[in-house]
Regions:
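Active-site gating loops and adjacent loop-to-helix segments of metal-dependent hydrolytic enzymes
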Residues: 25-58, 180-198, 216, 255, ...
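Active-site mouth loops of central-metabolism enzymes
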Residues: 44-60, 107-120, 140-145
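C-terminal cap of metal-dependent C-N hydrolases
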Residues: 311-351
Length: 351
């Protein structure tokens, strides 16, 4: 048995990166800015040829991304991976092989970024799911595929066929966003996929008003549909996270774009995302900051909402981090550096 001397540091649960893209990283190659694109379609159609031309392999670039996140406490990852005719299964196979070499958990989302229907990717997605992916993804089925009901029906059919979860990028606003969200709720209930469906970004949650707003948020909670956010700072874009939490909706954070074809920014810090969220929503007091940690730990917090000890407990998995922070609230607000992270008893990172 290995004994780690904590030197009177604070122990916290390991952080979970809930939304990233291993295959899109440009980390490790010379600086190249984001080129202008007139639409999401233009962006996705120029991205793959560019990534294929880079001097570093997907595996090398993904490792740079992982190495960027580990010092900030990440101990598990969920990555979306492009699967469509331009990539075939190349990216998926490489990410899956990489994941199998890591001591930490890597969940893989099959991501038909060019549109499940628009790019005729149903068969390829089916093949990737058969090879062991954890989730089926998608993006804006209303605006990109042009038939959100058919697109979502295929998505949930494949999820049911392979016994996997769903994690869909949803940037659409107003009617496009709200109708898509309501259809996801309906299909989650129909297929019995409670606790296995995630909506990433979910900007359209801002567009529900009045009684319908409460009804939809309550339905998300009832069907145990999770929301993933990268905490955008564009006005009126980030979902109303604190309101969702009050309704009992599970919310998680992820870094998303980190120096790729979509954004030149991103430092790989889940701590920064958490602190930014706290500032945006004016979270200041001890109890609220303590609970905020749960957004990057799958809901695990050191204290429960009544202030009682909640973690660690005897028998809990030995996945944790050590920090000089005085308490969880200080770790969240002050972004106190991580000194050591451990996954299942094995040291993953040491400062």
């Amino acid at each position: 048995m290995t004994i780690i001397d904590g030197h009177h540091q604070l122990i916290l649960p390991g952080l979970i990166e809930k939304h990233c893209h291993f295959d899109k990283s440009k980390l490790g190659v010379p600086w190249y800015p984001v080129t202008p694109a007139k639409s999401i379609v233009e962006r996705v159609e120029t991205e793959i040829p560019y990534l294929d031309s880079l001097e570093l392999s997907l595996t090398e670039r993904a490792n740079h991304l992982i190495d960027l996140e580990l010092p900030h406490g990440a101990t598990a990852f969920r990555t979306h991976v492009d699967v469509e005719p331009m990539t075939d299964l190349r990216y998926f196979d490489e990410v899956q092989a990489l994941a199998q070499t890591k001591p930490f958990a890597v969940e893989i989302v099959v991501f038909p970024q060019h549109g499940l229907l628009r790019s005729d990717s149903v068969e390829l997605v089916d093949q990737a799911l058969a090879k062991g992916a954890d989730f089926i993804g998608g993006v804006d089925p209303y605006s990109l595929d042009g038939d959100y009901k058919k697109s979502l029906a295929e998505t949930f059919r494949l999820a049911d066929k392979h016994g996997v979860g769903v994690d869909i990028h949803l940037h659409d606003r107003h009617e496009a966003g709200t109708t898509t969200i309501k259809e996801i709720i309906r299909l989650t209930k129909e297929y019995g996929l409670q606790d296995k469906v995630f909506i990433s970004h979910a900007f359209g949650l801002n567009d529900f008003i009045g009684e319908e707003r409460d009804e939809v948020y309550d339905a998300l909670a009832a069907e145990k549909i999770h929301i993933n956010s990268s905490v955008p700072i564009t006005p009126n874009t980030i979902p109303p996270i604190m309101e969702l939490l009050r309704h009992g909706v599970n919310v998680h954070l992820g870094c998303d774009n980190i120096y790729d074809c979509w954004s030149p920014y991103g430092d790989g810090s889940l701590q920064e995302k958490l602190a930014r969220l706290g500032e945006l929503f004016n979270v200041k007091d001890q109890d609220a900051l303590t609970q905020l940690l749960g957004l990057v730990t799958d809901g695990v917090t050191t204290l429960d909402e009544q202030g009682q000890a909640n973690w660690p407990q005897v028998g809990a998995e030995a996945t944790y981090l050590l920090t000089e922070a005085e308490c969880a609230a200080a770790f969240v607000a002050r972004q106190t550096p991580v000194e050591i992270s451990v996954v299942k008893g094995t040291t993953l990172y040491q400062k």
